[in-house]
Amino acid sequence: MSSLTSLTLKGALDGLEKGDFTSVELTRAHIDAIEAARGLNAFLLETPEQALSMAAASDARRALDAARPLDGIPLGIKDLFCTQGVRTTAASKILEPFVPQYESTVTSQLWRDGAVMLGKLNLDEFAMGSSNETSAYGPVVNPWRKAGSNQALTPGGSSGGSAAAVAADLCLGATATDTGGSIRQPAAFTGTVGIKPTYGRCSRWGVVAFASSLDQAGPIAKTVTDAALLLTSMSGHDPKDSTSLDVPVPDFSAFVGKSIKGLRIGVPQEYRVDGMPAEIEKLWADGIAWLKDAGCEIVEISLPHTKYALPAYYIVAPAEASSNLARYDGMRYGLRAEGSNLTEVYENTRAEGFGDEVKRRILIGTYVLSAGYYDAYYLKALKVRRRIAEDFDNAWERCDAILTPTAPSAAFGLGENSSDPIAMYLNDVFTVTTNLAGLPGLSLPAGLDANGLPLGLQIIGKPLDEGTVFSVAGVLEKAAGFTAKATKWW
């Protein structure tokens, strides 16, 4: 059955439609693959019985000619999405015993469309991290390795479990979230496709909050078409989320394969950062050449406030996190530590329940929101955020989409940057601007570095113009011809 796990999501839908195999067979093949790949630590919780039950229900619908858009497709769910009756931890000790009594909007829409849940995927604790090393349940290991090396590499973060599971053929797609690059950077590190849609395109209801004005759900998948199919199901207005946009959801997969002749593609000069590896420079140049060949006009643009994006992000995001994470006090749900009085219970619960990176961000956030520093830090960061959004507004007068690298390097070794938070934060240098401006951004694999590791290109689009992003991505995917897979060692 291993051939079933190597299918794309679209290929699996076609096979199910033709009757080449059943959803139960497809799901069983993925359950077996997950069991054999526990060394990757991609799944925090496996739900094989529930998966097979959902698959059987899917087969029954298909037999009645009542198949839904994703009927029978086995998916992994990032353990930040609440799943009714299934433990949801956000990869934190403080939520270890938490079983939600409700389903997140995004996952309920996937189940509505017939998808199958294989289990919950590992991540950085509360989605805070760029390497999946902050998880209370251990790091995820990237299925990719450097040529001739056994060194364990990071899959990126925070959606490291989602990216690793898709790259290792453990699921046909996965849900993920992106606050500063947490879909796109792991996709780049694992040779997968990931899209963060426009802020408000997918509901945040039932997704454990990190930074509410930046968080956005999206899919990680094997191909651009697969990502488009998943995003179509995940998107839509939700009255339970006050930031959800009440706009129509197109069939995003219809945009893949469209001609992009005449499109203006912006290339921001500020993204040519010092110390960027020559391989990433070359990949970017290749991407520009491929789009020129497709009939695009390449336009040099300026996003002058880019250099302030990371500092602004690492003020705004921790500030919102310190507020959001105040709810974890041991009273209503999650871990409760012992103490001789109420204050001690609060203090001990949070001290025992949160990991170091989460504590670091709560402290930073509390500091920048404090009376003496609010104006100097938080208010100033909000002004910078507005300037960054204005930079993009000005750029859209000259271009229709923007092409950049996704990350400043290929996957690095586990433990390599964990002692230096600043070095870790620099992984987000190309991705945080789209979160600050609320724009759609997609990463797709476009080449390998000298060590045989995947490298990604990022396409940034206008607000709610995921369609153009998918059209450009489809052309780049075809031109790059990226078919490499991680050599199985697990």
Swiss-Prot record:
Catalytic residues (positions): 78, 158, 182
Catalyzed chemical reaction(s): L-glutamyl-tRNA(Gln) + L-glutamine + ATP + H2O = L-glutaminyl-tRNA(Gln) + L-glutamate + ADP + phosphate + H(+)
Lineage: Bacteria, Pseudomonadati, Pseudomonadota, Alphaproteobacteria, Caulobacterales
Enzyme's top EC category: ligase
Protein origin, superkingdom: Bacteria
Nucleotide-binding in keyword set: yes
Family per record: Belongs to the amidase family. GatA subfamily.
UniProt keyword annotation of ATP-binding present: yes
Reported function: Allows the formation of correctly charged Gln-tRNA(Gln) through the transamidation of misacylated Glu-tRNA(Gln) in organisms which lack glutaminyl-tRNA synthetase. The reaction takes place in the presence of glutamine and ATP through an activated gamma-phospho-Glu-tRNA(Gln).
Gene3D superfamilies reported for this sequence: Amidase signature (AS) domain
The protein's name in its UniProt record: Glutamyl-tRNA(Gln) amidotransferase subunit A
Record key words, sorted: ATP-binding, Ligase, Nucleotide-binding, Protein biosynthesis
Entries under InterPro entries matching the protein: Amidase, Amidase_CS, Amidase_dom, AS_sf, GatA
Subunit note: Heterotrimer of A, B and C subunits.
NCBIfam families referenced in this protein's UniProt entry, alphabetically: gatA (TIGR00132)
Cellular component annotations (GO), alphabetically ordered: glutamyl-tRNA(Gln) amidotransferase complex
One GO term (biological process): translation
EC number(s) reported in the record: 6.3.5.7
Molecular function (Gene Ontology), one example: ATP binding
Pfam families hit by this protein: Amidase (PF01425)
